[in-house]
Amino acid sequence: MPKRTSLQNMGEAGEACVRQYLEEQGWQILAQQWRCRWGELDLVASRAGELIFVEVKTRSGQGWDQKGLLAVGIQKQQRLIRAAQAFLSQHPDLAELACRFDVALVEQRPGKEGVSYALADYLQGAFELWE
């Protein structure tokens, strides 16, 4: 089995941070790191007739890409939309729910007792399905 990189570990820690946030908001997590030929859906959750596909970007500093926001450009959005369509084709019982694409930006923060992760921004409806 390949060894985990520090970037993979940081990404998973960021996803765990967002997962906890969503659960505290009453969302039920349906899938995490769901993969298909189009890519990966970091988190899929539902609540009260809504379904969200959440892309999580975790950064250790400000960086050049606005805490990860610029990493979710048009091509990434198209891959996420295709992955969401694949997810829905495998879960037809969810296909009638209102769907939304959110982006969560997580910061890695150094501290006296090691690093911690905090939700820096959560963008509901960060992009829409368009053809």
From Swiss-Prot:
Annotated disulfide bonds: none
Assigned protein family: Belongs to the UPF0102 family.
Species of origin: Synechococcus sp. (strain JA-3-3Ab) (Cyanobacteria bacterium Yellowstone A-Prime)
Gene3D superfamilies: 3.40.1350.10
Pfam families in alphabetical order: UPF0102
GO molecular function, one term: nucleic acid binding
Full protein name: UPF0102 protein CYA_0708
InterPro entries: Restrct_endonuc-II-like, tRNA_endonuc-like_dom_sf, UPF0102_YraN-like
NCBIfam families, alphabetized: PRK12497.1-3, YraN family protein
